[in-house]
Amino acid sequence: MTKCIGFSILFSLGIFSLTTAQKIAIVDIGYVLDNMSEYTNAQTELDKIAETWQQEISVEQDKVKSMYNKYQAELVLLSEEMKQQKENEIIAKEKEIRELQKSKFGPEGELFQKRQSLVSPIQEKVYGAIQEYATERGYDIILDKGGSSGILFTNERYDKTDDVLRALKN
């Protein structure tokens, strides 16, 4: 009988510890950012820069079209050597435009770098506020509603990375 009562108490304590819920919150990062004047100003500045660069590229593309149209009009009058020279000029200009596009809009281009310099400090400010909010109010996990950022905050006690590494090493 004593064993049965002892087992019941242990079982109840085990169930109680399993049922302690984690405090979870959801934050819509996109909504937060869209409602920050700093962020919208940065986006406006980035849009203006991108538009200016796109116009520059369009001007250069128009030049290539003009070069090609002129080449087509003169084609019957050109020697083989001149044809080759004109074709090479057009190809070189097209390559120059692609390089310009890449330098401005590529993955490591000027627009990406400008976005990093303008937006990253704002994002860090938001993530800092989320960390502070979660810590002060005892949240264990905070998720991004939009899903683009995934987990925004997690209590360190739920990080089992080292446990998994130890298990793999054994």
Task: Give short role names for the model-derived ranges.
Residues 22-170:
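Amphipathic, charged alpha-helical segments and their helix-to-coil junctions
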Residues 1-24:
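Bacterial Sec-dependent N-terminal signal peptides
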